[in-house]
């Protein structure tokens, strides 16, 4: 989209989403404020591009300085969950199978108290919630029986919100191919470390 000449033109918050510190663990939309970023805090960036009437949604994270032990636990859980989604999103599987696999992975590792949700649709609306990537059936929101086929695109998303520690958010477009998938965003899942 960027190469085609996209613009920043849509958002839930009236601007791009930027949050730091305690504002990263709310798990909701995060409009920019006058809060000053502090050393040792997570910084969350959620950018919304548009080309024509097709929308994009990419989130990434940074940390100001090296993470402490608690932040490292959140980072590790977040990165491993992101990698798990990419690993299991394959043609021929259902969204419910993928959601169940990732949910069981999260629960098995003890992360279910702070990792929720795994993806949403994207297209003409910023959050086309149908079909949400989950193993739970919610009317007008999910279809766990939807079979993933080549050329299907899902906005994979992970939020890891630990109150008192910080929050991370990943949103990336994942294109299903004949043999697997391709992440259309090349940013790493690991947060950028920004030193003073």
Q: Language-model segments: which ranges?
A:
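Active-site neighborhoods and metal-handling regions in enzymes and metal-associated proteins
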Residues: 1-196
């Amino acid at each position: 989209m960027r190469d085609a000449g996209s613009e920043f033109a849509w958002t839930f918050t009236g601007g791009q989403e930027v949050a730091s510190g305690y504002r990263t663990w709310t798990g909701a939309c995060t409009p920019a404020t006058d809060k000053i970023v502090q050393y040792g805090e997570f910084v969350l960036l959620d950018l919304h591009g548009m080309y024509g009437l097709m929308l994009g949604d990419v989130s990434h994270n940074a940390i100001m300085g090296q993470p402490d032990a608690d932040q490292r636990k959140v980072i590790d859980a977040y990165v491993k969950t992101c990698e798990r989604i990419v690993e299991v999103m394959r043609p021929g599987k259902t969204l419910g199978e993928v959601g169940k696999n990732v949910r069981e992975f999260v629960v098995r590792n003890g992360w279910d108290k702070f990792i929720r949700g795994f993806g949403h649709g994207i297209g003409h609306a910023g959050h086309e919630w149908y079909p949400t990537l989950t193993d739970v059936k919610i009317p007008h929101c999910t279809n766990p029986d939807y079979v993933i086929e080549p050329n299907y695109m899902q906005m994979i998303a992970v939020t890891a919100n630990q109150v008192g520690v910080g929050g991370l958010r990943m949103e990336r477009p994942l294109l299903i191919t004949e043999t697997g998938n391709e992440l259309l965003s090349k940013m790493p899942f690991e947060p950028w470390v920004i030193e003073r």
